Structure formats: C-alpha cells, structure tokens
Regions:
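Active-site region of the double-stranded beta-helix
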Residues: 1-112, 126-182
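Histidine-centered metal-chelating micro-motifs
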Residues: 114-116, 121-125
Length: 182
C-alpha cells in the first residue's frame, strides 16, 4: 500500500498546520500557499517526486466512516499532524463494472508526526479521527491534482470515475458526492 518516509524534517510543516481549521465534517484544500512556502517544499518536490512541481494542502476534520475510495496516477505523500487512521485497499480489486467490495479495505493507524507515501495503486479517501479533537493530515500531490477538470471526459469506462484532475473516485450512493460514480 505504501511506505513510511525517512529523511524528512516535518517539524515546520506540522507547526504551520496548527493554524488550519478542524471542522466537524471534513475539509480538503489541495494547495496552501503558507505550507508551500516552507523549506520542506523543496525536499518533497525533489526527493518525493523527482523534481516534478507539487502542491501541499491538507485534509482535516472529523470522520468515522468510509464513504468513498479514490486513486491517482501517482503516489500521494501524507503527513499525520495528529494520530489518524487510513482506510485503504488495492486498485486492482476494483471490479470490471467499477464497483469495489469494501470488505477488502484495511485500516492502518498513522501516528502523529509520521510521513507516509501512499502508492498510486492504493485506494484511499479521507482519514478517520482517533481523538475527539479530529484529525489533521498534510496532503502532497503533483501540482493540479484534485482541481477542477478543464476538459470533458466520456462518462464510460474508467473515465466515468474521473471527478477532478488526476482523481478517480468511487463513492457509496448514500455519500451523495457530486459527480462521483456510485
């Protein structure tokens, strides 16, 4: 599914994240200027993505459920600011009709301060909180990921799962996620 990252100093990033909101639901912000201005940006871009332009954002809030899974064409780097649980699975387990059996999901505790690489073929979505104060998670992806599509997709095959740039999403029908494949 991924690996724990070594050789990064996330101290400044974690400190800056203390200024981000932790709502009662979940918020995702793909790119945050204050996070991208930190020294760690160069390390993440060069060591983590081989020099590709990246964005640093966050996913924060309170969550106790799996209502969707997504994947990208590249790894995602997460830094747990608080303890959190990731619910993850394998892209290869998506059925030909683009459904996914959630009984195959596994839960992993990511301790606060830990940086991880979530491989491109790993299904994931918003973390679950461990403590009543909610969760805070840094999200690093290639620049433009999870932003609005600027082109039309044919809503057939795998393209029917694309809801944003570099984002393929399968949602539970009760989640009512706009544009998602249910």
């Amino acid at each position: 599914y991924g690996q724990v990252l070594e050789g990064y100093d996330f101290t400044g990033l974690i400190k800056e994240m203390k200024h981000t909101p932790v709502p009662e639901d979940v918020i995702y912000v793909p790119s945050v200027e204050e996070l991208e201005a930190l020294d760690i940006m160069k390390d993440l871009q060069n060591k983590g993505y081989g020099g590709l332009p990246v964005q640093i954002g966050y996913c924060n809030g309170h969550n106790k459920k799996l209502n969707a899974v997504e994947y990208h064409r590249n790894s995602e780097i997460n830094v747990a600011v608080t303890d959190l649980v990731l619910l993850i699975g394998h892209q290869q387990d998506i059925e030909p009709d683009h459904t996914y059996d959630t009984s195959k999901i596994e839960a992993f505790l990511v301790p606060a301060g830990t940086g991880i690489e979530v491989y491109a073929t790993t299904l994931h979505y918003a973390p679950c909180h461990v403590n009543e104060g909610g969760f805070q998670c840094v999200v690093v992806l290639p620049k433009g990921t999870n932003t609005d599509l600027t082109f039309q997709t044919e809503k057939m095959g795998e393209d029917s799962l694309m809801t944003a740039k570099n984002k393929w999403l399968i949602a539970h029908e009760d989640a009512k996620i706009a544009g998602a494949f249910n």
